[in-house]
């Protein structure tokens, strides 16, 4: 299969990733000026959801429509994927009928197996390992507000989860330093840490992580599929709540990001999203624009007239 996929930030070169977020800025400007731009007319994106979603579904579906194409929502409950059809078989059929596939799933191996058997581009809409589309939006948001992130310091506060893993990949590809503050036993995947080398430092003190940082980011303490751990995680992660006082230790021009949905009063203080340093709403909107840039990059242009 010769299709180009987007399963990880490491699938592309740094120049390609920078080009994508710059293109996201351009597409956002076109949208804001009311310019009609439909390079993907008559193209169809399939969206396979094993995990529930608000931002991922809205941004991909609206983005594909705005680019002139269409999007089809497919849940495990409504397809043979949920009844045990092998992933490889499903991929071979689905990719003959669509022009691209976005998958939001649990096991990352589901994505890699689907992509290995797909004729068309496969996009990681989220897996337990990675959330690369969110990082495109985050990097676009930083670019819009502060310019290049190269050489800057980023602090990740909380669970070493899929978002944290993607921040590690972004640190490599966009050349910034990343400090991860998490409780013992909740570090990022060692494979990602090994890949990053000296670009990533793991600490136990959130104050040490945030000191002088140009960007501070966090996520929920309990991800989907971990609900039984909620009480224990709340107790362990309580010292890692991001507050206005914690942000005061960062660079004077620091930005705060959260991929949402946020649990106010848990990983962030109740008032943090309303702080002037928070760009979470721009960050959420940029899922739309960054992913439009990705779709434009991956999906072949419109068909020629017969």
Swiss-Prot record:
Instruction: Check the record and name the InterPro entries matching this protein.
Output: Asp/Orn_carbamoyltranf_P-bd (IPR006132), Asp/Orn_carbamoylTrfase (IPR006130), Asp/Orn_carbamoylTrfase_sf (IPR036901), Asp_carbamoyltransf_Asp/Orn-bd (IPR006131), Orn/put_carbamltrans (IPR002292), OTCase_ArgI (IPR024904)
Per UniProt, which keywords does this protein have? Answer: Amino-acid biosynthesis, Arginine biosynthesis, Cytoplasm, Transferase
Binding site residues for carbamoyl phosphate: 53-56, 80, 104, 131-134, 259-260, 287
SUPFAM superfamilies noted in UniProt: Aspartate/ornithine carbamoyltransferase
Q: Which reaction does it catalyse?
A: carbamoyl phosphate + L-ornithine = L-citrulline + phosphate + H(+)
Q: Which residues bind L-ornithine?
A: 162, 219, 223-224
Query: One GO biological process from the UniProt record?
Result: L-arginine biosynthetic process
EC number(s): the record gives 2.1.3.3
Record has Signal as a keyword: no
Localization annotation: Cytoplasm
On whether Transferase is a keyword of this UniProt record, the answer is yes
GO molecular function list: amino acid binding; ornithine carbamoyltransferase activity
GO CC annotations, alphabetized = cytoplasm
Q: Which domain of life is it from?
A: Bacteria
Q: Name one Pfam family in it.
A: OTCace_N
Give the pathway annotation: Amino-acid biosynthesis; L-arginine biosynthesis; L-arginine from L-ornithine and carbamoyl phosphate: step 1/3
Q: Sorted alphabetically, which HAMAP family does this protein's record hold? A: OTCase
Q: Which PANTHER family match?
A: ORNITHINE CARBAMOYLTRANSFERASE, MITOCHONDRIAL (PTHR45753), ORNITHINE TRANSCARBAMYLASE, MITOCHONDRIAL (PTHR45753:SF3)
The protein's matches in NCBIfam families, at most eight in alphabetical order, are given as: orni_carb_tr, PRK00779.1
The family annotation for this protein states:
Belongs to the aspartate/ornithine carbamoyltransferase superfamily. OTCase family.
Q: Which purpose does this protein serve, as stated in its record?
A: Reversibly catalyzes the transfer of the carbamoyl group from carbamoyl phosphate (CP) to the N(epsilon) atom of ornithine (ORN) to produce L-citrulline.
Q: Could you tell me what this protein is called?
A: Ornithine carbamoyltransferase
| Source organism of this protein record | Pseudomonas syringae pv. tomato (strain ATCC BAA-871 / DC3000)
Specify the taxonomic lineage.
Answer: Bacteria, Pseudomonadati, Pseudomonadota, Gammaproteobacteria, Pseudomonadales
């Amino acid at each position: 299969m010769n299709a180009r996929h987007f399963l990880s930030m490491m699938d592309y070169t740094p120049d390609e990733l920078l080009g994508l977020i710059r293109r996201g800025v351009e597409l956002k400007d076109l949208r804001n000026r009311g310019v009609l731009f439909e390079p993907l007319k008559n193209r169809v994106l399939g969206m396979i959801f094993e995990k529930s979603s608000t931002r991922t579904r809205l941004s991909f579906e609206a983005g594909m429509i705005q680019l002139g194409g269409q999007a089809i929502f497919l849940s495990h409950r409504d397809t043979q994927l949920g009844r045990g059809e092998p992933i490889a078989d499903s991929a071979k059929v689905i990719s003959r009928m669509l022009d691209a596939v976005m998958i939001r799933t649990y096991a990352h191996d589901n994505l890699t197996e689907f992509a290995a058997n797909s004729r068309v581009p496969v996009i990681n809409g989220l897996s337990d390992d990675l959330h690369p589309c969110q990082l495109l939006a985050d990097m676009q948001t930083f670019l819009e507000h502060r310019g290049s992130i190269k050489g800057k310091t980023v602090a990740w506060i909380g669970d070493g989860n899929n978002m944290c893993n993607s921040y590690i990949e972004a640190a490599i590809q966009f050349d910034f330093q990343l400090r991860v503050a998490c409780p013992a036993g909740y570090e990022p995947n060692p494979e990602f840490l090994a890949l990053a080398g000296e670009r990533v430092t793991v600490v136990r003190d959130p104050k040490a992580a945030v000191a002088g940082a140009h960007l501070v980011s966090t996520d929920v303490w309990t991800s989907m599929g971990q609900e039984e751990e909620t009480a224990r995680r709340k107790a362990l992660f309580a010292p890692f709540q991001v507050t206005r006082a914690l942000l005061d230790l960062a660079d004077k021009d620091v930005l705060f990001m959260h991929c949402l949905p946020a649990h106010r009063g848990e990983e962030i203080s109740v008032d943090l999203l309303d702080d002037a340093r928070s760009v979470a709403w721009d960050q959420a909107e940029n899922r739309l624009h960054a992913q439009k840039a990705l779709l434009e990059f991956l999906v072949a242009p419109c068909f020629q007239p017969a």
